Amino acid sequence: VKRNWLESPILYMALIGRPGANKSHPLSFAFQPFIEHDYCQNQEYQKLYAEYERTMSMSKKERMEAGLDEFPKAPVRRRFLVSDITPEGLSLIHAQNPRGLCLWSDELSAWFKNFNRYNNGSEEQFWLSVFNAKPTISDRKSTQSSIFIRRPYISVIGTIQKKILGELVKGERSSNGFIDRILF
C-alpha cells in the first residue's frame, strides 16, 4: 500500500432484470431513509428560503433596525439524492453538498442516453473523471462563477433491462473502461 494513496468508495451500480422483474421496488425500499432525509431537508430549506425572501424584501435600513444581517446569505438545500440532472447542475449542487451525492435513476438507460443530450460525449468523460474522484471544474456562461470541486464524491445507482444494456455497451463505452466501472 502506498503511503499517500487515497481512494474514494464511489460506486456505480446497476440492478439488471427483465421488464417487470421487480427491480425498482427493492431499490426504492433501500433508499427510503435517504428519500425521507432529503424530504425533511427540503421542507427546512423551503422555510429558510421563505424567510430569506422576506428579509430580502426589506430595505437595508429595515434589516439593520430589525437586527438582521445587512446582506443575508441565501440558504442552501442539503441533500443526498439527485435524479435528472446536467453535469453543470450537478456541480452546483455538489458544491453546496460537499459530503457527496448519489445519482438515483430508476432507468439507467436514461442516464446513458443523456450523455449526448447537450454535447457530443463530454458528459461521459465527466462521469469517467468523477468515478476516479478527479477534480471537476465547471465554467459555463450560464453560471455566475466557476465551480471547482477538488475531490468529487458522486455515486450512481439504478436499474436496467438486460436487452437495453446490451445495446448501450456497444461502441466506445466498452473500450474506454466506462462499463467496467459499473457493478452489475
Task: Go through the PLM ranges and name each one.
Residues 1-184:
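Phosphate-handling catalytic cores of nucleic-acid transaction enzymes
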